[in-house]
Amino acid sequence: MITVVFCFSDCHGGIQILGRMSSVNKIKLNENNKMHSFGNWERCRNLGEGGFGLVIHWRNRTTGREIATKHIKEMGALSADQQVKLSERWNKELNWSRQFKNFPHIVAGVDIEDPDFLEYLNGMFSAKLPVIVLEYCNGGDVRKRLQSPENANGLTEFEVRQILGALRKALHFLHSQCGICHRDLKPDNIVIQRGVDGKKIYKLTDFGLARGTPDQTMVQSVVGTRHYYAPEVVENGFYNSTVDLWSFGVIAYELVTGELPFIPHQTLKNIILNLIKKPAKCIAITEDPEDNTRFVNQFELPQTHHLSRPWAAQFTKWLASPLNSNYKERGQLAANNVPVVFADLDKILNMNVLTIFAVNNCERLEYAVSAEMTMKDLIALIVLDTGMDEKELYFVLPTSHPHKTITPKSTPLQLYVEEWSDTSKDSRKWTKRSNPPVMLYIFQVKKECDYKIPEPILSILSRKFIANKFKTKERWLQKRVVLDMLYVLTKEQARYEMLVSGINERALSLEDEMMENSFIDSIDKQRIIISFAYDQLTSLLKEAQAKIPSRQLISSAQWEKLNRNYNFIIQSAKSIRSFLEACLREAKDMVKTTNQLRKEVCEKDLFDCARFYKKYLCNGAIISPSELNNDAEEFAKSRFKLYNEGEARHLPKSIDHMHYLYFKTKESIPVLLQQFCDIKKEIFQINLQMLMSASSTPPPKLELSAAMDRLAISSGSPSSDPFDSLRTINAIEEAERINNILVNEMKIDHY
């Protein structure tokens, strides 16, 4: 069997070498590694190397185009029969690569419009098999993604979905359109093409072991990497394209958990024996750490994953289908002639999961949302899960949310933002975009808010390890307890980041609300109008009484009541206005403080995860029960200090207090505006009363001064000049003018 790896990647520059090589081959390898070019084509580096094959990365200096070329170096060490088989397989792969040109999820062959360069490529080695020219994928492979520190316990749900969706399409295309069974599916053979926007496209590659798949089963040699091939391959050698479905299931489990599902550290014999007899719904097999002769069938995912609860539940049900040991059941077709494995996967890939962070409970919530779901349905679920009163719930959308604001007509599906499911550090780095950790924040709004911080829980395995319950300290057990502890550390880091982000978003939301709501402008406008009308009425009444002392236009009690009401409402308006201004200043200060806190927290390794990962997973240090216990205690101390002495303790309460007072002040504004309306009516009635009294009085022979003619009123900045004379007809006109202003102003909308 000849294995050539071509995971075309700029990441992790090491060369992967498979197969045994003689000293002669090693010398040739060193010679071939010398970087040289041909024309405009620069040879960048070797991507993959085997005993017979080589994959090279090239870049065109003029156009910037990048390609990968796959070669057979020499076949002299093979028998004539082996050379024929290799040639047949090679030419099939060459032809297949040309079939993939228009399919986005398979690495395709490409054309080179440079016959001299193509001739050079074909003449590089003694083997006369034609070069295979392929598109170059610049983002590494999925194996490298699984090996990154943030993915030690599996990938994020977003990336899992993206990879499974791409692999499902690639396999269905190969099986149904090309009649090809890949036979060597594994994370190493799923490569990544990263676009200029940083987004990733996943592509299946390496068809060195692929063969045509007739409808009937066929006897084949055992190929593929042992942890990914189906039990029937080893059991009897009879298999068909359903072996790819099994490998698909193994990859799916590994993507989610970071581990292989079926006792990978055990002997091949133990693995196969347990696979053959496992129940249909079993999705993993583990070794009992207290009895290494006992193996346990698992029907649920381990808790150390990064999936949302609703999606994890559906994923677990689906996973039993591709991991069914019975290949006939595994390959069942749905009504549309698509394998049930693919049809059921399509359903869960279409699930929309709304992510929420309940700040008062310091808890992440996740709900599957659909077009039929209402906000009432969502609120009922939140109340059930948090124990908060529905009337006390306050929703805050992240600043950049496309829905902008929640209205009575909003639906939960409108709050879902698909791209925000991608919260990985890798995406943040390449897309230059930092998605919020959730799609919605919820808070409790009342005078004294309740706060609860859930306690992190060490796995049972870790607790038993610390208590020295295990006689054996095998490497797999060491690694598992380290991964369990790392999961606790990373989850707590993520929880604290969500808490701080929520506090920051609430401060931003309050500031925006205060700036957008024109309460101060409304109060100022009404205060100016009322003050003007009151001053006009006072001047008019004073002059009228001076000119007609014998006639009392209004009673003293009526005037005192008006004066008392006027002074009260003006003072109330000033107080409310002053408080609103103070709230806005405080909100701006809170925004500055929480912006800085959020930046610091997101850039800091709060619980020293990197050191822990490097020491025990990169450098392979052996962890003892006492060391694990010490790490757990240090984590507990750091966590206690953060939640009880850090800014995240007092900031929420300060914002709570400000929000509650602002909320109560908002409730008083409609009352204030109604009081403005009421006093307008009072002034209107007094003006009307004066008008009627003046109309019944014989007009005195007095002339209005020029100041009366200059009286001007506007809704923007009303003004008037005092007058020193009064005639009945002018008194009526003046009263009517004031009345008209008040009538018009009483028609304004109130909050």
Curated annotation (Swiss-Prot):
Q: What class of enzyme is it?
A: transferase
One Pfam family of this protein, by short name? Pkinase
Which residue numbers delimit the Protein kinase domain?
41-341
Specify which residues bind ATP according to the UniProt entry for this protein.
47-55, 70
Arranged from A to Z, the UniProt key words for this protein are: Antiviral defense, ATP-binding, Cytoplasm, Immunity, Innate immunity, Kinase, Nucleotide-binding, Phosphoprotein, Serine/threonine-protein kinase, Transferase
A single Gene Ontology molecular function, please?
Answer: IkappaB kinase activity
Gene Ontology biological process terms, A to Z: antibacterial humoral response; cellular response to hypoxia; cGAS/STING signaling pathway; defense response to virus; innate immune response; peptidoglycan recognition protein signaling pathway; positive regulation of antibacterial peptide biosynthetic process; positive regulation of canonical NF-kappaB signal transduction
Q: Where is this region: Leucine-zipper?
A: 489-510
Q: PTM details?
A: Autophosphorylated; upon LPS stimulation it is transiently activated, and can be autophosphorylated.
Enzymatic reactions: L-seryl-[I-kappa-B protein] + ATP = O-phospho-L-seryl-[I-kappa-B protein] + ADP + H(+)
Q: Tell me, how does this one assemble?
A: Interacts with key to form the I-kappa-B kinase complex. In vitro, interacts with cact.
Identification of the protein by name: Inhibitor of nuclear factor kappa-B kinase subunit beta
